[in-house]
From Swiss-Prot:
This is Leucine-zipper-like transcriptional regulator 1. Pathway: Protein modification; protein ubiquitination. Substrate-specific adapter of a BCR (BTB-CUL3-RBX1) E3 ubiquitin-protein ligase complex that mediates ubiquitination of Ras (K-Ras/KRAS, N-Ras/NRAS and H-Ras/HRAS). Is a negative regulator of RAS-MAPK signaling that acts by controlling Ras levels and decreasing Ras association with membranes. It comes from the Eukaryota. It comes from Mus musculus.
Amino acid sequence: MAGSGGPIGSGALTGGVRSKVAPSVDFDHSCSDSVEYLTLNFGPFETVHRWRRLPPCDEFVGARRSKHTVVAYKDAIYVFGGDNGKTMLNDLLRFDVKDCSWCRAFTTGTPPAPRYHHSAVVYGSSMFVFGGYTGDIYSNSNLKNKNDLFEYKFATGQWTEWKIEGRLPVARSAHGATVYSDKLWIFAGYDGNARLNDMWTIGLQDRELTCWEEVAQSGEIPPSCCNFPVAVCRDKMFVFSGQSGAKITNNLFQFEFKDKTWTRIPTEHLLRGSPPPPQRRYGHTMVAFDRHLYVFGGAADNTLPNELHCYDVDFQTWEVVQPSSDSEVGGAEMPERASSSEDASTLTSEERSSFKKSRDVFGLDFGTTSAKQPVHLASELPSGRLFHAAAVISDAMYIFGGTVDNNIRSGEMYRFQFSCYPKCTLHEDYGRLWEGRQFCDVEFVLGEKEECVQGHVAIVTARSRWLRRKIVQAQEWLAQKLEEDGALAPKEAPGPAVGRARPPLLRVAIREAEARPFEVLMQFLYTDKIKYPRKGHVEDVLLIMDVYKLALSFQLCRLEQLCRQYIEASVDLQNVLVVCESAARLQLGQLKEHCLNFIVKESHFNQVIMMKEFERLSSPLIVEIVRRKQQPPPRTPSDQPVDIGTSLIQDMKAYLEGAGSEFCDITLLLDGQPRPAHKAILAARSSYFEAMFRSFMPEDGQVNISIGEMVPSRQAFESMLRYIYYGEVNMPPEDSLYLFAAPYYYGFYNNRLQAYCKQNLEMNVTVQNVLQILEAADKTQALDMKRHCLHIIVHQFTKVSKLPTLRLLSQQLLLDIIDSLASHISDKQCAELGADI
């Protein structure tokens, strides 16, 4: 996805951490492995995942509105158009995000006619407005959609209409628009009679030489829709939900600009143990930041939810973002975190809070305020709304306006603080280990053909109890055979041998598995996923059915669910009979039921029974289909919760905590104290260990642990092992000092651990742990942190002096504290003397 004030883990997204938000720096393996030059910034910071209510737009500046657009340019938000409930608007408002002030933007030239449900994008130093709905909504006259294109130049305030020759997109409103590769792209919308799903693009570099082009889309094109958002991330355009009549869904689609192909992204929330996608909705917003898409608001089945949903583009999972605790305290000011303050004892991070609805707590306040107000304002969650608009500046999202309860237009502005950390590479690292087949120590002999597939005992025994038993049986058989042959001393201590540079492969026979589906199963054990086959292709569906059979036999609930999701989503008229027959042959009852129910549907049955494949079905299956059609069985919805099994992270956590002790094959020495571990796991996660085990494997199977010249504490060493085995980044702040340089020294594949260590140090120094951190800073020569700890001790000495750990400090550290106290008292006396003079 937690420790005290910890940052985001690999599970649900949570708030309550103060951060500069983007601690990710370029990963440079040539960087010094010492923390002596570590520079820390002790605030004040904005809280990660904090909502803040900013000054609303006053009526004398601009009306409350909905169905408008907002764009971000430099340090300002620009609001154009919309409606105030009575009339359409075409004013342009500007909100300065630095001083939180509203004003009317300077404009010259002829602006677009008043409109709403238009689109606005930024390209270069201009804003482009396309289409929308115009006319007089009060008298219900002259209402029509537009397909005009206007440019607003921020530098001069000049409005200009682009006159385009040739074919034009049909006039529309409530469409999606974005900029990519110097072009404006528009998709779908409403033309006054029907919803659309066509796409058009136009170059924005030179209006004299450009024209509209219709895009030939392919793939799984979204249904015709309107009132939906689009966002670009990872060179792809994403579309989520929207109004599609009877076809409205909560599907997420992605569009590849290069080959102009759409793909519907499958959801696997049951399998991954993550929350489901947001409800289907319309009138919502979606913005992109880092590798995430953020969806807020909209109308979802007659409700106005105010949860913020986050989609991870890399891992294809949805999460509900938990707001920081200070988002929920009305009237609270943002606390300062200055290192010179005597309130340094308040440097604790807030506990992670569970999400609460705020619409019943916070009322709407549109009272008149000045156009410029202090930054430190009441922190509140925005209420649910639709037809609002959102934009991103730096590391924050700004949401303005919209329609709230009782059809009231809003003039509120809210700010949401993003988080940004390097992604977890755990699954990728183990995937590379599987693909590379280095350090394999087990060979599975499969089926009657005795095909061989190699793997790693540590990964396999961590993920599958069934395969673990087979491996243990093979080890016991081999040990007995060697003992009978006289190759093993009878009195040798039990347990795995360590230190062999190239131990022989352990052979494990599995007669019930064939090589190809078993390799897919192995890929899942290493990565928690399988590479998606071609959807609907009979060969691929049958392969996954074989994998499904193995998952049932090996009791891999997680893989079982994944296979079922893929197969059920892939069943269509072309392959249903083949899949049904295969399911009957493999005795896969649930899949067979799914196929039978698919066949006997009114819209499918006549087509299926006229196929040639139907004539070749076995007689019992034909009889079952006919009887199912004549007398469908009663539906019995199951209330049984779905068992999704354990994840890779959960299994590796249990493995480190003791479940894998009998399979250790390397010993790590910390100050002479042994810690058994697993070579394959260390090599997968660290290029340092990979190179050592490949070329410089110690003969005695023991590796001394240090980080450069420094030996970490036992506690910090265990924190590092937790990161290596299952990607855990939460740890006590003192551990972060030891491990700050670990990503460079041990060659981790990105600086995720370092980013969390840096934030942990900046955030979580308190009176309660300052002495432990002082000791760690002294040992690691982290001078910046040591000065900060001494500063806190001096200003909070009354509290620190009562801590029992003070009496356990070394003599030198006690002298450092006395020196700092003397200096502080001297400076204070000088200041008082100067004031008296």
